[in-house]
């Protein structure tokens, strides 16, 4: 299982990457493996304000449909529109081309509450 050290994580298997004042978000390698082959992703709308813990979309695989939750509060400034035609990118590269959305205006307290890669990995055992 791939687990980049430079990302932050949630217990719900989302990852968060700080980049130039914004935060890129996706699901972890563990999560995509549990879901199986992903066939559809419902994305939030650019301009939406999302609240930590709220369902902001869904990920459909051959096994199940799973809600995707906001790991932090913020404003959606971009979504990975490539996933509309190629949702399997989440399976093949969840930390790069399989990213899901980008937020700004993020609550700093939400970021500090996220898990390090070591703490996230301990929770998987």
Curated annotation (Swiss-Prot):
Quaternary structure (record): The glycine cleavage system is composed of four proteins: P, T, L and H.
Cofactor(s) named in the record: (R)-lipoate
Disulfide bonds: none
Family: Belongs to the GcvH family.
A cellular-component GO term for this protein: cytosol
Cofactor comment text: Binds 1 lipoyl cofactor covalently.
Name this polypeptide is given: Glycine cleavage system H protein
Modified positions (N6-lipoyllysine) in chain numbering: 63
Gene Ontology biological process terms from the UniProt entry: glycine decarboxylation via glycine cleavage system
Classification via Pfam families: GCV_H (PF01597)
HAMAP family tied to this protein: GcvH
Coiled-coil annotated residue ranges, if any: none
Organism: Listeria innocua serovar 6a (strain ATCC BAA-680 / CLIP 11262)
Function: The glycine cleavage system catalyzes the degradation of glycine. The H protein shuttles the methylamine group of glycine from the P protein to the T protein.
Domain of life: Bacteria
Span of domain Lipoyl-binding: 22-104
Keywords: Lipoyl
């Amino acid at each position: 299982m791939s687990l980049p050290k430079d990302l932050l994580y949630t217990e719900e298997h989302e990852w968060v990457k700080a980049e130039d004042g914004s935060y890129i978000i996706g699901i972890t390698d563990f999560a995509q493996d549990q879901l199986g082959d992903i066939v559809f992703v419902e994305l939030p709308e650019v301009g939406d304000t999302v609240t930590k813990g709220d369902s902001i979309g869904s990920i459909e695989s051959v096994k199940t449909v799973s809600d995707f939750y906001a790991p932090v509060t913020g404003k959606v400034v971009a979504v990975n529109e490539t996933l509309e035609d190629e949702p399997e990118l989440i399976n093949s590269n969840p930390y790069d081309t399989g990213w899901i959305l980008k937020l700004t205006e993020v609550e700093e307290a939400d970021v500090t509450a996220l898990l390090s890669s070591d703490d996230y990995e301990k929770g998987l055992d």
